[in-house]
């Protein structure tokens, strides 16, 4: 699957052996959740960026029955999914909308997930060629007292993390 095929929805749908009608968005569910932090990070986050605990979860259902999910931090990514964007997306083709950055990060992520699943293609292939076999993960926190940072580093090591990042 090449990028030109992704941009040309008709050839993309044909390439995946799917009817464009199976990519029609029939439902969008949104939920806002308050994410808990462990005690030490919570003290630091409450001091600096308390709004980071709020996230939006979005589930998109396509006419073919495929569901895609996406998530985004309400105050960190490029936008929350508005009621207007939900109304705009319902009834439209997910492959045509998935590149629309105005829809909100969580909805856009859910569209990529649904289109990828509909075509039995990993979502990363919709963005281009795979570059790596694995993705390194870091344990992270914002600045905090030395005692708390030591506790966090020990927890990260115990859980197998090889990198610790502080913001």
Regions found by a protein language model. Name each.
Residues 12-69, 73:
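Structured beta-strand/loop patches that form or line metal/cofactor-binding pockets in enzymes
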Residues 10-29, 116-117, 121-134:
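N-terminal amphipathic alpha-helix/helix-capping segment at the start of soluble metabolic enzymes
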Residues 128, 132-167:
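Metal-dependent enolase-superfamily TIM-barrel catalytic cores that perform enediolate-based chemistry
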Residues 20, 52-53, 98, 102, ...:
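Conserved active-site and cofactor/substrate-binding residues in soluble primary-metabolism enzymes
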Residues 44, 96-98, 136-139:
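A short, structure-level motif marking secondary-structure boundaries and short turns
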Residues 22, 27-29, 59-122:
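Metal- or metallocofactor-binding catalytic centers and their adjacent structured scaffolds
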Residues 1-6:
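N-terminal export leaders
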